[in-house]
Amino acid sequence: MASLIGNLELPRVSPNFLELRKAVRPYLKEHVHIGLSGGPDSLALVAAVLAEKSQVTAICIDHNLQTGSAEVTHNAAAMARHMGAQAIVKSIEVAPGEGMEAAAREARYAAFAQLTDEIWVAHTMDDQAETYLLGGLRGNPAGMKDASRRPELSIIRPLLGARRAHTHGACVELGLKPWHDPQNFDDAFRRVAIRNQVIPLLAQVHGGDPVPGLALAARRAVEDAEVVEGDVEKRRLEWQDGFPVTLAGEPTGLRRRMLADFLRGEGIAVTSRKLDAIDRLLTDWRGQGGVAVGKSDNGRLEVVRQSGKLKITD
């Protein structure tokens, strides 16, 4: 008798799908919520988790940013149900314009948080490599964690060790018809340009596939950041009532993370420019004035050095 997930018959030989099934096994729970766009990555993830006998609720978000988005979202939900998953369709509004990608991501995660406290997403090793390069262009090369936390939502990324070729190949093996987002072919989006132009060029220069090395660098950046963040968390009480200038002697990376934590604890948005100027109040103190960090009802918020501490005044 053929193996089934829902009404979908599984092929006897499916090497790409097997890679995904192996990838999800360390993360499995009885019931998993998965963000499903209908694209090959998330569709293959839903199938892999179902094949491993977990229950799945697919959450399909319609961002209302493209013509026909409602049809795409409902088709994704229908494919999930065909495989035996439950599916929820939720419509959200995202303001178009500059920064639309980030705004859509924030709105999507906010919608997930209304429906569950943990969401699985289908980022692959290829996404990890692209994220690392994009971060490097902003001066902050970093990677994605396989498990990360937002205030009201845990995010699980079980496919960071799998390739995009595996998810696309699995859809072919299973006879699934994923949606292909037209924006993924538009090099006006920086991530797409990285994918379609930069990584192929790196492959030529490198003489081989650059993705595993970039993904490894991203993972190491994540691991290093976790060490520093752990130290910051343990020492947070030290700057509960102002940031002591005695911390100027800490290693640069740790000190700047501590400063950023101090500022965020006071509700201040952190930028590299602000952090550089505030750090100089510690490491290059010449009696300079305060650093503007925002506004309050009484005027301008500043970080100033007084009585052996950095403090926020207005």
UniProtKB/Swiss-Prot annotation:
Its EC number is 6.3.4.19. NCBIfam families: lysidine_TilS_N (TIGR02432). Its main location: cytoplasm. This is tRNA(Ile)-lysidine synthase. The keyword Cytoplasm applies. It catalyses: cytidine(34) in tRNA(Ile2) + L-lysine + ATP = lysidine(34) in tRNA(Ile2) + AMP + diphosphate + H(+). GO terms for molecular function: ATP binding; tRNA(Ile)-lysidine synthase activity. It comes from the Bacteria.
